[in-house]
């Protein structure tokens, strides 16, 4: 599954979180599941719907869509497309509502699925972490909390390394000393279902920059 948000946005003019658009998004998912069942019967090979974040395609598919359809506001105007059925990364929604919403789509992703909530540094608020984890356990198949763990080797800054635009390109910058050297910046972000410490293509970097907190 890719770009459920963009598909529904183009077809209805609304986010798939809008109550009037959610049934259409779920209908698409069910139609895809029905197709998998049909192919399985035809070929005697198992087919299944997988809610994949698939790291490399978020940028590649965005460029292909722009080339084919041009720039469509709210649909193809970014360097990335939304992972699977997820709420758009820039959409303001709290952690519990996001998990509740996406749980509907996980039930229609029998091949695998994962959801995320973006949180600030929670080391001094473990009660809140436990509350979210309990909600995950009670309400959704699989989900993770994303936090930030960065370090600048040049000045010793221990906090969030920022993404800034420099000469038309997105780069990582230490907010304390201005260091741009990726060799001396330790940046950890969740991408494609795991916490990565390598740097990312421009599309994924734009997506990371656009993420809003859910707590």
Segments (PLM) and residue ranges:
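Long, C-terminal-biased catalytic regions of enzyme "large/alpha" subunits
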Residues: 1-215
């Amino acid at each position: 599954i890719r770009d459920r948000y963009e598909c529904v946005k183009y077809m209805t003019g609304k986010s798939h979180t809008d109550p009037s658009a959610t049934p259409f998004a779920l209908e698409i998912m069910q139609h895809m599941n029905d197709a998998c069942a049909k192919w399985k019967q035809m070929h005697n090979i198992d087919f299944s719907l997988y809610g994949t974040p698939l790291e490399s395609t978020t940028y590649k598919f965005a460029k292909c869509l722009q080339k084919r359809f041009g720039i469509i506001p709210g649909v193809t105007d970014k360097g990335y497309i939304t992972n699977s059925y997820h709420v758009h990364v820039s959409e303001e929604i709290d952690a519990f509502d996001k998990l509740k919403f996406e749980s509907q789509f996980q039930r229609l992703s029998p091949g695998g699925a994962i959801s995320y909530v973006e949180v600030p540094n929670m080391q001094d608020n473990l009660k809140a972490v436990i509350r979210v984890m309990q909600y995950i356990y009670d309400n959704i198949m699989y989900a993770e909390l994303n936090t930030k763990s960065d370090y600048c080797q040049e000045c010793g800054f221990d906090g969030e390394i920022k993404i800034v635009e420099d000469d038309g390109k997105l780069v990582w910058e230490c907010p304390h000393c201005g260091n741009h050297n990726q060799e001396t910046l330790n940046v950890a972000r969740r991408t494609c279902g795991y916490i990565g410490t390598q740097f990312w293509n421009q599309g994924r970097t734009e997506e990371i920059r656009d993420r809003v907190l859910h707590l």
